[in-house]
Regions:
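Interaction interfaces in information-processing and related assembly proteins
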Residues: 1-160
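Cys/His-clustered metal-coordination modules, chiefly Zn-binding fingers
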Residues: 131-226
Length: 226
């Protein structure tokens, strides 16, 4: 089904205030980040000392699953270790599915993620094995191999079933945002139009600005008035 979407929200009390990312079933993704200035006289801690990670899985049928966990590792300055530790915490706490991650953030479009999940009967030492396997896969990738080649090199008994490209694409549009505005109700929209002359929206994902005049919203206001 191409209507599903997964969203991740990360909030900390450090310089990184909010990080939001989402990807749909067509592998179109978008993301935004908000940062705050460090208080005067304090050490600049990017991840702070507290916060939470939230994951929303929407199957497209208005049945979203929302899970969350407190951040467990804010001390490391290494982004790869930070994300790996906290996603592992999320899967353990919220979904009760032990998972190990390996991240590579090379800058720009050069990034890599590998994950291994425990299955019934995997044994008590699976974590050690998973850690070693992930380190080996990551090393292969850093040596110039593709993601599929890296996995096949370490897990020789498996093969890549499918390769798909991820692309950055915002799904905002005038029609989509009118649907969002409908949740404000007619009275609120009328008040904004009266005070400002237009309802203005800034998309934080693609930085596009929208301005809806009374003429633009005539049909919506008519429907809301019924």
């Amino acid at each position: 089904d191409k209507r599903g979407e997964v969203s991740v929200v990360l909030k900390t009390d450090g310089t990184l205030e909010n990080l939001t990312a989402s990807v749909n079933a067509a592998l179109s993704d978008r993301a935004s980040m908000d940062c705050r200035e460090a208080a005067a006289g304090t050490a600049d801690s990017f991840y702070g000392t507290g916060g939470f990670l939230q994951v929303v899985r929407d199957d497209g049928y208005s049945r979203p699953f929302v899970g969350a966990c407190a951040l467990c590792d804010n001390e490391t300055g290494n982004a790869e270790e930070f994300f790996a530790a906290n996603f592992e915490e999320y899967f353990t706490v919220s979904e009760q599915l032990p998972t190990r991650f390996a991240f590579y953030l090379g800058g720009g479009c050069d990034y890599f993620l590998a994950a291994l999940q425990a299955l019934p009967g995997c044994g008590k030492n699976w974590e050690v094995s998973a850690k070693d396997k992930l380190a080996a896969v990551l090393n292969e990738y850093r040596c110039g191999k593709s993601a599929a080649e890296s996995a096949t090199s370490v897990f020789g008994e498996i093969s890549c079933e499918e390769e798909r490209d991820l692309r950055y694409r915002c799904n905002c549009s005038a029609e989509y945002l009118k649907g969002v505005l409908s949740t404000l109700g007619k009275d609120e929209l009328e008040s904004i139009l009266q005070e400002q002359g237009a309802v203005k929206i800034h998309c934080r994902y693609c930085n596009k600005d929208y301005a809806f005049t009374r003429t633009d919203l005539a049909d919506l206001l008519s429907r809301l008035g019924k």
